């Protein structure tokens, strides 16, 4: 069986429901009601959503899809931080050792959340992408 048969083509969009004053960096995430409002608008034109991290936002999006019965598939991203400094990164890929060590711990937590969410929402999540930001040699997110 080929991957094309397993994963059919879908109209997809990257989704981030953050509004003014909301940010994963500050821990202020869109509410389920805000997410549901967005998904009502998106459902007319899109079949799949791309999420970039396994954080509270992703958990809420998946819960809303399930609770409201939205017909979306999700490509879940696991956001990976640098575990290795990269002096070739044009915008500064050098990190202190303690930062790299903390990133390694966070990366492990992120991967565990990705697995847990993929298992919990296996009827919604059809792809997990880990470390998209770490796949090029010029990144500040080397692993």
Where would I find each of the regions flagged by the language model?
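Flexible, active-site-proximal loop/turn residues at the rims of small-molecule/cofactor binding pockets
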Residues: 19, 55, 134
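Conserved, mostly hydrophobic/aromatic
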Residues: 13, 49, 128
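Catalytic domains of carbohydrate-active enzymes, especially glycoside hydrolases
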Residues: 32-57
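Substrate-binding cleft of extracellular glycoside hydrolase catalytic domains
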Residues: 61-143
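Boundary/entry segment of secreted carbohydrate-active catalytic domains
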Residues: 1-37, 41
